[in-house]
Amino acid sequence: MQIALTGATGFVSSYLANVFLEKDWKVTPILRDDLALSSKDLAKKIDGSGVIVNLAGANIVKRWTEEYKKELYNSRIDTTIKLVEAMGQMSRKPKIFISASAVGIYDDRGRYGESDYNFANNYLAKIVKDWEEAAFRAREINIRTIVFRFGVVLGKGGLLAKMLPSFKLGMGGTIGNGRQSFS
């Protein structure tokens, strides 16, 4: 199995890459420089990959200046559009395109599932809506498309490891009012 993977240095994708390699699957990392290539050249790089996994995107745990909001948006939507364009030009198209998304599409008023369409009306929800729309364009070229709406991802070296020192020093405090959801 040959898999092409964006966001290869990220938290989730670096873990996934190791899982794929342990199964003796060939992993082709798609780096930022590769995304600057023309769609045709990117298609050549990933040609023959049976699965394309798109986990690219700037880290949302930073200060959201107007400039950084643009980076958050472009690193997801532009990357996804470029990948779909490249897949359309591949001589051997992938069977599956898996793209990340986020639970930030939902408002904070209840419990939601994948068939709910009562989305939030904020900047993060706009990013997610546009991101999913860009990913689902792969269906137009007959590629099975799967979108995962990630919430907080917990794992070794992740968010909790960064928060723990403050809590150990007694500076962590209560997070929220205790009634908020955790996804």
Model regions and ranges:
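N-terminal Rossmann NAD(P)H-binding glycine-rich loop of SDR-like oxidoreductase domains
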Residues: 3-23
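Rossmann-fold NAD(P)-dependent oxidoreductase module
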Residues: 15, 19, 86, 134
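Conserved glycine-rich Rossmann-like NAD(P)H-binding loop of the short-chain dehydrogenase/reductase
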Residues: 26-32
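NAD(P)H-binding glycine-rich loop region in Rossmannoid oxidoreductase-like domains
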Residues: 34-82
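Catalytic helix-loop patch of NAD(P)-dependent Rossmann-fold dehydrogenases
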Residues: 110-147
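NAD(P)-dependent short-chain dehydrogenase/reductase
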Residues: 125, 139-141, 146-183
